[in-house]
Amino acid sequence: MPKKAEAKTGSSSKTTKRTVAKKDVKAEVNETNKTAEKVSSKKVNKTANSVDTNESSSNSTPSTGSKFELSSFKEKVAEIENNILQKIKENPTITGKPFRKLVSVNKLMETGAHIGLTTRKWNPKMKKFIYTKKGNNHIIDLLHTVISLNVAYNFLLDLVKANSNSESSPVLIVGTRGKTIKNHVKEQAKRSHAFYINERWLGGTLTNFSTITKSVAKFNNLILIHKNGEINKYTKKEQVELKKKTEKYAKYFSGIRTMKELPKVIILTDPEINKIAIKEARNLGIPVIAICNTNANPDLVDYVIPANNHSIKSVYLLVGLLCDAVAEAKGLPKAFAEKKDEEILLPEVIKRKPENRRQNNHSFNKN
């Protein structure tokens, strides 16, 4: 056997020997995950697998050069969706409450939610959420995504309703990756009257909340100085300094200006780049909902939503759905949940061409 083949078989045997660690979370989440595992252990269909694998290579909906024609692709997606819904129908208690079709499988696949990271980056603890492997990527089992999304949605719905008399919103949304996601987190949090952090997480935001509150009070005071014209009393040099200070505070505290108490839950778009936030939440017993890619550690998250969190469209859709739960609990209109596919508008993602990335390297060329 060639050396490369030996290396591959050796690494794969080591991987299969690893055991998936079990996490201690709430009883209802444990029960849901166990039931979901039993249901998903039955493979969907060979045809369903072929659609997933073709999808992974393009990282989006199939292009004109894909193996399936568009009509055929839609038929395959419909077949996958029917299989998933049938499995849920056979296990009505799988989501803890009556199942709600929040979004179609077709829309999830359109966003690339099922496409995991490359296999070398995976965390073995995410094995139960993975459907198969295609090429260099893992494919996420959308059955788990649909079920987990329902469980998280119901949890948020009940939590916000239970805290309806509170002056402060119980939900804090954290999304710090990429300009589009940062802006979307801000928009959706404002729409659902939730708190948000879309810049770097400051250590101690939760565990040292009293100090953070003092900084927020200073920020609110600076805003007041600008609004009532009191800033004109200062010299030009002092005005410039105050403006810089205000902008610095605004960057980190704009989304939590009115947060008077600790949140009851935090929602993360990427647990891997916000590990400090997870650690603080766990220390204080605050539940964590997170969109987990195949590289995440699900043991650190209370409500895992397995999906591609490196895809702008995928995160855009899932954040919108979770914020709809908060909005619904407050009697506000929904923007994503239970809408038709054509009613859900996703951002246009423009990929830079390789030549554009290297346009500044011409200075090294010799004439």
UniProtKB/Swiss-Prot annotation:
Residues 21-40 have a biased composition (Basic and acidic residues). Residues 53-66 have a biased composition (Low complexity). GO terms for cellular component: cytosolic small ribosomal subunit. InterPro entries: Ribosomal_uS2, Ribosomal_uS2_bac/mit/plastid, Ribosomal_uS2_CS, Ribosomal_uS2_flav_dom_sf. Residues 1-68 are annotated as: Disordered. Disulfide bonds: none annotated. It comes from the Bacteria. Pfam families: Ribosomal_S2 (PF00318). Keywords: Ribonucleoprotein, Ribosomal protein. GO terms for molecular function: structural constituent of ribosome. GO terms for biological process: translation. Belongs to the universal ribosomal protein uS2 family. HAMAP family: Ribosomal_uS2_B (MF_00291_B). This is Small ribosomal subunit protein uS2.
